[in-house]
């Protein structure tokens, strides 16, 4: 016998603010943190340090788009060319997301071993540990499967780690600060170039 499925019902509460459909909400989302907004901020720097971090996926897309002839180009050379252009537009620091990604993986590893050790001692931490750099997935878990939240890793994503690097290392170095502070962090404008609109959910 066939199982009769119930009719699915979708409400605005189910929206993940992704780029999968064209709605007024998506239009607002795309309009926020846009290229036009970045240009306006660059035209009014007010003594702030401007840091931009570019993901490897975005670098690959830029290489495919802007290389005039089909030939190999190393990631380092490509990033150097893009960095030169971005600095001419007003950015002080151009960074690759790879460092932040490696730091995030190491932090996830430490969290996993800490959870495993705690489970053997008092069972307080849940395993398996679910880890994802996709804020859309985390948003989905929060809205639709709250029972999974104890299993979701608390470690920062690569994009969040990049934000910490920008606010505490790259920015203060550019501003000439001896150490990072809250006031110094406010004087750092950080832009991240990522391949998905969902990344705006954690920006």
Residue map of PLM features:
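Iron-sulfur-associated redox domains of electron-transfer enzymes in respiratory
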Residues: 1-203
């Amino acid at each position: 016998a066939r199982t009769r499925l119930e009719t699915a019902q979708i409400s605005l509460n189910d929206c993940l603010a992704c780029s999968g459909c064209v709605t007024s909400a998506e239009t607002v989302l795309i309009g926020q943190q846009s290229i036009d907004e970045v240009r306006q901020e660059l035209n009014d720097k007010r003594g702030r340090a401007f840091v931009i971090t570019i993901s490897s996926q975005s670098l690959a897309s830029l290489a495919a788009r802007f290389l005039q002839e089909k030939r190999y180009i190393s990631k380092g050379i490509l990033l150097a060319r893009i960095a030169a252009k971005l600095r001419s537009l007003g950015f002080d620091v151009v960074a690759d997301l790879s460092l932040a990604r490696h730091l995030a993986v190491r932090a996830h590893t430490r969290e996993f071993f800490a959870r495993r050790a705690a489970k053997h001692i008092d069972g307080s931490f849940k395993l398996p540990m679910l880890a994802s750099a996709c804020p859309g997935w985390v948003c989905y878990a929060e809205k639709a499967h709250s029972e999974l939240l104890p299993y979701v890793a608390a470690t920062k994503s690569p994009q969040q780690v990049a934000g910490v690097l920008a606010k505490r290392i790259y920015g203060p170095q550019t501003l000439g600060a001896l150490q990072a502070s809250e006031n110094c962090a406010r004087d750092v404008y950080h832009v991240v170039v990522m391949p998905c609109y969902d990344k705006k959910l954690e920006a």
